[in-house]
Amino acid sequence: MAYAHVFASLTISTISLRRFLPRLHRNHSVKPNSRIICNLKLNYSAGKFREMGLSRSVELDQFITSEEEEGEAEEIGEGFFEAIEELERMTREPSDILEEMNHRLSSRELQLMLVYFAQEGRDSWCTLEVFEWLKKENRVDEEIMELMVSIMCGWVKKLIEDECNAHQVFDLLIEMDCVGLKPGFSMMDKVIALYCEMGKKESAVLFVKEVLRRRDGFGYSVVGGGGSEGRKGGPVGYLAWKFMVDGDYRKAVDMVMELRLSGLKPEAYSYLIAMTAIVKELNSLGKTLRELKRFARAGFVAEIDDHDRVLIEKYQSETLSRGLQLATWAVEEGQENDSIIGVVHERLLAMYICAGRGPEAEKQLWKMKLAGREPEADLHDIVMAICASQKEVNAVSRLLTRVEFMGSQRKKKTLSWLLRGYVKGGHFEEAAETLVSMIDSGLHPEYIDRVAVMQGMTRKIQRPRDVEAYMSLCKRLFDAGLVGPCLVYMYIDKYKLWIVKMM
């Protein structure tokens, strides 16, 4: 068989069975509903492992239960012992022996046979042979599958604990695939998750590299379930996602880029996951800077100086550049998938929004539309607010063309975003014009927006026309019933004169 030369000898060090002892005796009975508790241990020294002169072990606890009634008992028949003896002699093919005794072996006896050949001193190659035969004969029920999957997971776990090479772990998955062991989950994802749970993320990266090398060089692919396929990112995408969940955004991006630059080819969706990590990194940076500014205003920390500002902008630009590179690779690898193009522009849009790059974000909005992926209305509003804060007049005009086709509630929300964008950028004259435009349209701006504009206009009064604009705004708000009568105080320094006017 294909796996006979590479798989190891798997053994059990300790077995505790309520009705089953390591040394089997005839006339011994097992209750079908009894619980079988096994501590399985793997010692591999055969095949490739034997050639390396390695000696390791794998342990796991497995519980086997039966759904049969409590009162029944099942005798271990003569066929079971004869099959064990024949298999141990290794004078005939295991499949021939099992085929000959098929009608004499119950499901429980076949489970015990799998356990038996995993014992210390037994050749666990027979375990795989027995399971493969069961699979071929369609005799793998839920309990047998659960037992075999647990054995394999335990072997993988111990290999990882003992810091075995990534190719040895992958070889084990190949053996699993060869014998037809296909659990309802992705074994590839399970292995990566085990690496991460044990805090061995660097080893997980090496394992993923081994997977890509085997796939690209020899065509080996272990799917096993819908995990990676469902996520469409494959093992690279899954590991990047694990890094991202743990908050290690830079590591997720570094890994995907390093794999690509080393000549390996991650799946197209893994680039999208890495781009999501960049979005989260930029968003985290923005939150940190806002917190820093808040602490600086409170006097807890010093203000950001010019040198720090340059470093921040440099880091942000470098992060965006990496995102653009990932986008290029994603488009190259996903040319046959139209949906990927739209998602790429969506990720780029999110990146530019987090970085506060208005014109670039607007460009991605239109590219998303051209790719057939309609952006949400809120994204339009956010981009427009960023452009307003940077006084990008042309971009704001283009984005405002949607307003005339909106209902009153949606229109109010969009204009509120525009107003807040102007306020954030310190453009209070434009904010006041937007405020008046909302009032003229019968839309009452929120109280906090009105206050922000009024306070900003007050601070900006320096020229005669600033006074006129402020007084005009006060009168317009009063006429709309949004403020009470206003007392406007003005001091003329030249004449040392105070002028008070009721509006």
UniProtKB/Swiss-Prot annotation:
Range annotated as the organelle transit peptide: 1-50
Top-level taxonomic group: Eukaryota
Gene3D superfamilies membership: Tetratricopeptide repeat domain
Signal peptide region: none
Annotated InterPro entries: Pentatricopeptide_rpt, TPR-like_helical_dom_sf
PPR repeat extents: 341-375, 376-410, 411-445
Listed GO CC annotations: chloroplast
Subcellular location: Plastid, Chloroplast
Assigned keywords, A-Z: Chloroplast, Plastid, Repeat, Transit peptide
Similarity-based family: Belongs to the PPR family. P subfamily.
Protein name per the record: Pentatricopeptide repeat-containing protein At2g30100, chloroplastic
Source organism (scientific name): Arabidopsis thaliana (Mouse-ear cress)
